Amino acid sequence: MVKMIVGLGNPGSKYNDTKHNIGFMAIDRIVKNLDVNFTEDKNFKAEIGSDFINGEKIYFIKPTTFMNNSGIAVKALLTYYNISIKDMIIIYDDLDMEVGKIRFRQKGSAGGHNGIKSIIAHLGTQEFDRIKVGIGRPNGRMTVINHVLGKFDKNDEIMISNTLDKVDNAVKYYLQTNDFQKTMQKYNGLK
């Protein structure tokens, strides 16, 4: 069986470590101690890495389409590698959740997230597994765009690092158990 773990974000160094790139940050944390090297594939518009875990080929994906067109890369890779939607997890930021909180869902609307809107539009379904990482709402007069494209406050950096460890543990637990429902029950709502 083959699986695909996708972290959403924006390509380019100016977006490194921004809140909107929490999906890329999660992928980097997950592969940190694995034998994964990323190569940018311009045909698929993604950085692609892979490894074998428990005898299964796992693809780790960071779309380079920019957030709002993430569905282009996701659809192309699912099709090319013949991966079922049920064997894919999307990791992304959520404005409506407290900073550092994680939530697992098996289906649902985009909730205003343009990357998820793109994936839903290209796949033709809302039924795919996802891990949402809370980045909180902007304070005061800050716009949503400035908030999501901003970096985490110093106060939040340790919490986000711990959150990324939890996402790493959850994904590896899922890959061991092959059971997203069980993973949800164990890790949902952690902070």
Curated annotation (Swiss-Prot):
Instruction: Specify whether tRNA-binding is a keyword of the entry.
Output: yes
Read off the CDD domains from this record: PTH
Query: Which Pfam families does the record associate with it?
Result: Pept_tRNA_hydro
Annotated site residue numbers, Discriminates between blocked and unblocked aminoacyl-tRNA: N10
Binding-site residues, tRNA: Y15, F66, N68, N114
A molecular function (GO) held by this record is: peptidyl-tRNA hydrolase activity
Q: What EC number(s) is this enzyme filed under?
A: 3.1.1.29
Q: Where is the active site?
A: H20
**Which EC class is this protein assigned?**
hydrolase
Under which name does UniProt file this protein? Answer: Peptidyl-tRNA hydrolase
> Per the UniProt entry, what species is this protein from, by scientific name?
Streptococcus agalactiae serotype Ia (strain ATCC 27591 / A909 / CDC SS700)
Q: Which gene encodes it?
A: pth
